[in-house]
Amino acid sequence: MIKPLGDSALLIQLGEEIDITINQRVHTLNAILSAASFNGILETVPAYCTLLVHYDPLILTFDQAARWARGQMERMDDTTRRTPRKLEVPVRYGGVSGADLEAVAASKGISPADVIRLHSGREYTVYMMGFTPGFPYMGTLDERLVMSRLETPRTVVKAGTVAIAGSQTGIYPLDSPGGWHVIGWTPLKLFDPASETPFLFVPGDEVKFIPLPAPKLDDHA
């Protein structure tokens, strides 16, 4: 489905739920559209199950942009899917920057060590980027860690904080407000505006969290 979004964008909807297969199709289509040169197309923005396409309304009408997008969609197949990058993220769980670890464990009737084991025991896909520059929305959590957001968000969550909410996990790239349960911290820099590649993650990446022993990393408070 392709529909207009304002007077200078169109939205391509490939599904209606958070699903890895749908999300992979989004990223496949995004790669195709990004590689195709077409006068008037400005930018593409992938999300969970949609792809937003910005165009210049002085050059293209909605119908022209949609017709081009449909033509590119016909090129979608398994052979065009980008091979995902695999990234490891070191994490110090608990401590000041992982202050919700024990509360998460208690609410689930498991130990903090179990939370760490479950969180670090699988690979996550970066479904999309958003909220603040470089924030990766990743899934899917083990169902035993699925939790609602905090009733009262924090006014400040430190950059590098690893958190969970719903069936997702993410990392705060900047000091910012946040309503997710914070369970750890990573020393990796997720956003560097001075770099030619300012974002550590891109949609479609596969991420594995690696627990760090406490003595190897100073607490990030």
Regions found by a protein language model. Name each.
Residues 1-221:
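Glycine-rich active-site loops that engage anionic ligands at enzyme catalytic sites
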